[in-house]
Every structure is written in C-alpha cells, then in structure tokens.
C-alpha cells in the first residue's frame, strides 16, 4: 500500500472513531470531561517517547495493548467515556491512529462550539500574550473564535507557520531563506 493510501486510511479511521466518541460524549453531556481527558493523554504522549512508540507499534498484541492502556489510564486518572474509548481502540488494534483521533475530536468539538482550530508551528514557545495576540489576529481574518495548538519546531529558525483549515500561512525564516536561495540560483 503506498504511503499516501496508508495516511488516508489512518485519517479515515481516526475521524470515524473521533466522531463516535464526540457523539457519545455530546449525548451524555460529557464533552468537557472527555476533552480534559484527551488533553491529559495528549500531554502524556508528548512527554513520553516510550508511550509514543508503544501507541505506534504494531508489535504488541491487542491483549498487551489493552492491559497497558488500562494501567496508563488508571495512573493518569482517566476514567469514564475516554477510558472506555481507549479500551475499545486498544482491543480493535487502532492505537496507531490515536494521535489522529485526538486531533479529529478537537476539531469536531471546536466546530460544535462555533470555533475553528489553527495549528501553529513556532521556533520557540509562544508566551500567553503572543498566543492571545495571534488568536485576535486570526479571529479578525476568519470571523470566528480560534483555538490554537502550538508546536515548537526549532528547525523553522524563526517566524510562524499557521494552518487554518485548508489554508497555510508560512512566515518561517527557513522558508524565506529557501526562497532567497532559489532566487539567487536563478540570478547566478
């Protein structure tokens, strides 16, 4: 299977699972608690390379994945819908798509609240004031409240890469230097 097909498969799986989780959470009035659990689990993924490898690895059996997910959920204080959701995901051997499920759930929840999500990549962590200023600027462009997810990537050197829906604004120093390099090659 080509790489693009694998990515589309993962995305489709993630969106279906996230949609099901959101529908159930909405029906039970638990969207906020599920979102908090999602955030807690995402923070654990971000902090632990071992957990990231475990989630992505097809080597572990469904039974091993289920046992580990139950232990991790209990230790992190994750219960209710999201804990049960994690069990279903592990039992169905879909942990590899969990990061996409979390992302898709956030997008669905934001859309439900009348917000849009923006993915922001920065060379350095943004201060609270910078995040607020960015939200205000994006709201003036989109006309909607904006939630932002910031990723730090030192390789962009400076500036920002902002993705809102299908639009991307790249003001990174890396891109500007690359453009300058191409322009100089054409001149010389």
Swiss-Prot record:
It comes from Rhizobium leguminosarum bv. trifolii (strain WSM2304). This is ATP synthase subunit delta. It is found in: Cell inner membrane. Belongs to the ATPase delta chain family. It is a peripheral membrane protein. Pfam families: OSCP (PF00213). SUPFAM superfamilies: N-terminal domain of the delta subunit of the F1F0-ATP synthase (SSF47928). GO terms for cellular component: plasma membrane; proton-transporting ATP synthase complex. One of its GO terms (molecular function) is proton-transporting ATP synthase activity, rotational mechanism. The keyword Transport applies. Gene3D superfamilies: N-terminal domain of the delta subunit of the F1F0-ATP synthase. InterPro entries: ATP_synth_OSCP/delta_N_sf, ATPase_OSCP/d_CS, ATPase_OSCP/dsu. F-type ATPases have 2 components, F(1) - the catalytic core - and F(0) - the membrane proton channel. F(1) has five subunits: alpha(3), beta(3), gamma(1), delta(1), epsilon(1). F(0) has three main subunits: a(1), b(2) and c(10-14). The alpha and beta chains form an alternating ring which encloses part of the gamma chain. F(1) is attached to F(0) by a central stalk formed by the gamma and epsilon chains, while a peripheral stalk is formed by the delta and b chains. F(1)F(0) ATP synthase produces ATP from ADP in the presence of a proton or sodium gradient. F-type ATPases consist of two structural domains, F(1) containing the extramembraneous catalytic core and F(0) containing the membrane proton channel, linked together by a central stalk and a peripheral stalk. During catalysis, ATP synthesis in the catalytic domain of F(1) is coupled via a rotary mechanism of the central stalk subunits to proton translocation. Keywords: ATP synthesis, Cell inner membrane, Cell membrane, CF(1), Hydrogen ion transport, Ion transport, Membrane, Transport. It comes from the Bacteria.
């Amino acid at each position: 299977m080509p790489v693009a097909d694998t990515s589309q498969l993962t995305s489709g799986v993630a969106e279906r699972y996230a949609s099901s989780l959101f529908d159930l959470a909405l029906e039970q009035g638990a969207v906020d608690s599920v979102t908090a659990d999602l955030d807690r689990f995402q923070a654990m993924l971000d902090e632990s390379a071992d957990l990231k490898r475990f989630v992505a690895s097809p080597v572990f059996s469904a039974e091993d994945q289920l046992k580990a997910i139950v232990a991790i959920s209990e230790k992190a204080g994750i219960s209710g819908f999201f804990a049960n959701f994690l069990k279903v995901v592990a039992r169905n051997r879909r942990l590899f798509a969990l990061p996409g499920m979390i992302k898709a759930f956030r997008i669905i929840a934001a859309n439900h609240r009348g917000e849009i999500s923006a993915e922001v990549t920065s060379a350095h962590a943004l201060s609270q004031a910078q995040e607020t200023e960015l939200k205000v600027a994006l709201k003036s462009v989109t006309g909607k409240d904006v939630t932002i997810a910031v990723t730090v990537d030192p390789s962009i050197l400076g500036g920002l890469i902002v993705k809102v829906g299908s639009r991307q604004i790249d003001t990174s120093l890396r891109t500007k230097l690359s453009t300058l390099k191409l322009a100089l090659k054409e001149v010389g």
